[in-house]
Swiss-Prot record:
Pfam families: Ribosomal_S2. Keywords: Ribonucleoprotein, Ribosomal protein. The lineage of its organism: Bacteria, Bacillati, Bacillota, Bacilli, Lactobacillales. GO terms for biological process: translation. One of its GO terms (molecular function) is structural constituent of ribosome. It comes from the Bacteria. PANTHER family: 30S RIBOSOMAL PROTEIN S2 PROKARYOTIC AND ORGANELLAR, SMALL RIBOSOMAL SUBUNIT PROTEIN US2M. One of its GO terms (cellular component) is cytosolic small ribosomal subunit. Belongs to the universal ribosomal protein uS2 family. PROSITE patterns: RIBOSOMAL_S2_1 (PS00962). This is Small ribosomal subunit protein uS2.
């Protein structure tokens, strides 16, 4: 049984790509058709590739992989943080700082500074410092937490990186590739898929679509770490009377949505 059903993908709007004029021709094989100037992603392929991504992430987690979730645009930020935390992993959901991976030593120094400021508050140091200095420290902590809080406890450079919108996160992808870190990503019709190791053709601009795919990969990590019983089997995964499971039905839904 597929880990994500066609019905779930349709309801989340995973099939909607970008305007045809903004497409990347390398994504042609993942596109089913065009409707009203919008490319429609072939969801039968999305189902297949989502299965492959799930298996990849589950197997990596079973081998104690450290996974970094990356998604800095507003549609992805909440899901990336929530699902990374739920699966016991790490995330960056604000601006990617250049060198986060390739200059890991420097990043660790900034993380150490963040932890130092937190300790200063906890051990009472703030109480004996001038208010102005405390205000500056709090400002520094807030900034460090914003950009590095999601990787504060990451023990090492990640073994796998999951990315929402690699077109936007090009620097992150390049750093991962330079270090030989495999990249799993939601890839929309405007993206070059060549640098992605495990592709999930999908709309990466809709909050529901991002949540659906990201949550499923978090499930894969949990299963890899804890076994099948750790992941609840949702009733939606079973065939239903309303499930669309043919290309023709997808087109009908798309035409209806764009009417």
């Amino acid at each position: 049984m597929a880990v994500i059903s066609m019905k779930q993908l349709l309801e989340a709007g995973v099939h909607f790509g970008h305007q045809t004029r903004r497409w990347n021709p390398k994504m042609a094989k993942y596109i089913f058709t065009e409707r009203n100037g919008i490319h429609v992603i072939d969801l039968q392929q999305t189902v297949k590739y989502a299965d492959q991504a799930y298996d990849f992430m589950r197997d990596a987690a079973a081998n104690d992989a450290v996974v970094l979730f990356v998604g800095t645009k507003k549609q992805a930020a909440d899901a990336v943080a929530e699902e990374a935390v739920r699966s016991g992993q790490y995330f960056i959901n604000h601006r990617w700082l250049g060198g986060t991976l390739t200059n890991w030593g420097t990043i660790q120094k900034r993380i150490a500074r963040l932890k130092e400021i937190k300790r200063m508050e906890e051990d009472g140091t703030f109480e004996v410092l001038p208010k102005k200095e405390v205000a500056l420290l709090n400002k520094q902590r807030a900034r460090l937490e914003k950009f590095l809080g999601g990787i504060e406890d990451m023990p090492r450079i990640p073994d796998v990186m999951y990315v929402v919108d690699p077109h936007k996160e090009q620097i992150a992808v390049k750093e991962a590739k330079k270090l030989g870190i495999p990249v799993v990503a939601m890839v929309d019709t405007n993206t070059d898929p060549d640098d992605i190791d495990v592709i999930i053709p999908a709309n990466d601009d809709a909050i529901r679509a991002v949540k659906l795919i990201t949550a499923k990969l978090a499930d894969a990590i949990i299963e890899g770490r804890q076994g099948d019983d750790a992941v609840a089997v949702e009733a939606e995964f079973a065939a239903s009377e309303t499930q669309a499971d043919s290309i023709e039905e997808i087109v009908e839904v798309v035409e209806g949505d764009n009417a």
